[in-house]
């Protein structure tokens, strides 16, 4: 079994795409994983472990790698014992792309979406389901609209900031040999063709998916976070574009602040 890391921004359609991929018995797929946080805790604690001082750097690195890779594979096999690929998902793995490449020697999948649609999706959730939210209100700056201030807050939040800065670094440093970008918009238009590209990247044989019979993955949404509200369509034919509510000042901010993103992925 190979381990592949998926660390996309929220509201990019990654849950929909993984729900489709789960049709393929070659995959072990789950929702958000707790393993990234355990990895960081493990690294912190092992650095304080005195018995590790008896090992050389190479010995300790090899044992850590073996322990964690087998642990990740074991987690995946518990999901699907016959799987060839385990997709380990947590947005914050984007903070560890060097670890993934040089230590785990694994590949990364990142789902992309127009940032205006990401912001629009969050805006609609926050405005329509604000009863449990207090992170994205209480703005009192007169020169900027409330919507623009909310958008600033969205993109300052770690859930977006960490994956997005990782994407910029991948572009700046040309780290495309182990990263596959899949655009949500392309998937909606040509789903099988886009997944065929993914299979080629993962060195798997193509699989014919049923895009009219999509079953949602088991998951528990949290009412406390706008990022975790999912409504997966059962068929791509039923896919509807979200009502667009962003104002011109927000659109200008996103297209200016993230010009590099649009030039690389949406320069059409």
Residue ranges and their predicted role:
Residues 1-74, 131-153, 211-260:
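PAPS-dependent sulfotransferase catalytic core
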Residues 13-27, 100-103, 181-206:
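PAPS/PAP-binding and catalytic site of the sulfotransferase fold
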Residues 68-75, 120-201, 258:
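PAPS-dependent sulfotransferase catalytic domain
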């Amino acid at each position: 079994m190979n381990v592949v890391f998926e660390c996309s921004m929220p509201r990019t359609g990654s849950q929909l795409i993984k729900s489709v991929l789960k049709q393929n018995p070659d995959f072990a797929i789950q929702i958000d994983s707790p393993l990234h946080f355990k990895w960081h805790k493990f690294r912190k604690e092992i650095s304080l472990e005195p018995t590790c001082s008896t090992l050389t750097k190479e010995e300790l690195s090899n044992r850590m790698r073996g322990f964690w890779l087998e642990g990740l594979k074991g987690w995946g096999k518990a999901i699907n014992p016959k799987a060839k690929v385990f997709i380990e998902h947590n947005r914050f793995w984007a903070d560890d792309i060097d670890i993934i490449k040089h230590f785990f020697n694994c590949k990364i999948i990142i789902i992309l979406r127009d940032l205006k649609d990401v912001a629009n999706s969050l805006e609609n959730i926050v405005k329509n389901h604000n009863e449990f939210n207090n992170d994205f209100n209480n703005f009192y700056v007169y020169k900027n609209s409330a919507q623009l201030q909310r958008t600033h807050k969205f993109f300052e939040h770690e859930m977006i900031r960490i994956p997005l800065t990782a994407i910029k670094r991948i572009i700046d440093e040309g780290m495309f040999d182990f990263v596959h970008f899949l655009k949500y918009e392309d998937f909606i238009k040509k789903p099988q063709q886009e997944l065929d590209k993914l299979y080629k990247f993962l060195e798997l044989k193509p699989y014919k998916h049923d895009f009219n019979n999509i079953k949602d993955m088991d998951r528990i949404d949290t009412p406390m976070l706008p990022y975790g509200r999912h409504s997966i369509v059962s068929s791509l034919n039923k896919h509807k574009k979200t009502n667009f509510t962003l104002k011109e000042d927000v659109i200008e901010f996103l297209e200016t602040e993230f010009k590099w993103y649009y030039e690389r992925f949406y320069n059409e």
